[in-house]
From Swiss-Prot:
It is found in: Cytoplasm. Residues 1-16 have a biased composition (Basic and acidic residues). Promotes cell proliferation. InterPro entries: F-box-assoc_dom (IPR007397), F-box_only (IPR039752), Galactose-bd-like_sf (IPR008979). Residues 1-53 are annotated as: Disordered. The modification Phosphothreonine is found at T46. Gene3D superfamilies: Galactose-binding domain-like. This is F-box only protein 50.
Length: 266
């Protein structure tokens, strides 16, 4: 299931956006791009603060049930996973991406005006966890490509849950209607097996804006992976935002509030 809508639509002003069709989708790659290279730490590790008393196993389960809602009778934890661990790590119903809003932009307001800049993107916010590259296009245009590879087992999800229950994996993103080109944004997501090469499911979309509404509004793109099959261990998230080179520097399309989350099926 996929959805593309702007912020005004979510606020109640139901202005219809142009629907996406197969002609708007970029070609499906034969295989996902290589995973990002490990990043060197840029600062010393901060000592951990003392933690408050953790809930008991029974208390942790009750708190999570209150938070998640009624659980399926089939949901059983393997011996290596405890309710206390799930309460601490919160692998479900939260954003698994690092730095989802690197520039601190509020989607409930129009994108703040900004001119061209010669500063590197990494100097414009906190992009920890993102692997960033540039893809040059014809003329003054280019893509800024940002990627993350989410290790679901490292986030304390477990094989039996992913293979047997196959919880929903929800992707959401917001991009600025920058009007730099007809298509200023692309989203590519792959669900990968343990080898990080075998593709189990994928989603690709390149929405075109219709030119209506004020420039700088935020447009939402979303997709839910359901019943994707067993073996998923990684979510490879990639989005592209278009830039245009001008005399004063690079004018960018901004992206914010990117998310990858996992939910139990209802």
């Amino acid at each position: 299931m996929e959805k593309t809508q702007d912020r005004d639509t979510l606020s109640g002003r139901m202005e219809a956006e142009g629907s996406l069709n197969s002609e708007e989708l970029p070609p499906h790659p034969q295989s996902p791009p290589p995973p990002p290279s490990p990043r060197s730490p840029t600062s010393p590790v901060t000592p951990e603060l003392p933690q408050p008393n953790a809930p008991t196993e029974v208390e942790a389960r009750q708190l999570l049930v209150e938070e998640w809602g009624p659980l399926s009778g089939k949901l059983e934890l393997p011996p290596r996973i405890s309710w206390q661990l799930l309460f601490l790590e919160r692998p479900l119903y939260r954003n698994l991406l690092s730095s989802p809003n690197p520039e601190g932009i509020n989607i409930y307001q129009p994108a703040p005006p900004t001119g061209p800049t010669r500063k590197p993107l990494k100097e414009l916010g906190n992009f920890r966890g993102w692997y960033i590259t540039t893809q040059n296009l014809q003329g003054p245009l280019s893509w800024t490509v940002k990627e993350q590879c989410v290790n679901l087992l490292a986030k304390k999800l477990w094989e039996e849950l992913l293979d047997d229950e196959q919880p929903d994996i929800t992707i959401m993103d917001w991009f600025e209607d920058s009007r730099l080109d007809q298509c200023v944004y692309e989203l590519h997501v792959w669900l990968l097996a343990a080898d990080r090469r075998t593709v189990i499911a994928q989603h690709h979309v390149a929405p075109r804006t219709n030119g209506r509404g004020p420039p700088g509004r935020w447009i939402q793109v979303s997709h839910v992976f359901r019943q994707y099959g067993p073996g998923v261990r990684f979510v490879y998230f990639q989005h592209k935002a278009k830039n245009r080179m001008e005399p004063g520097g690079l004018r960018r399309t901004r992206v914010t509030d990117s998310s990858v989350s996992v939910q139990l099926r209802e």
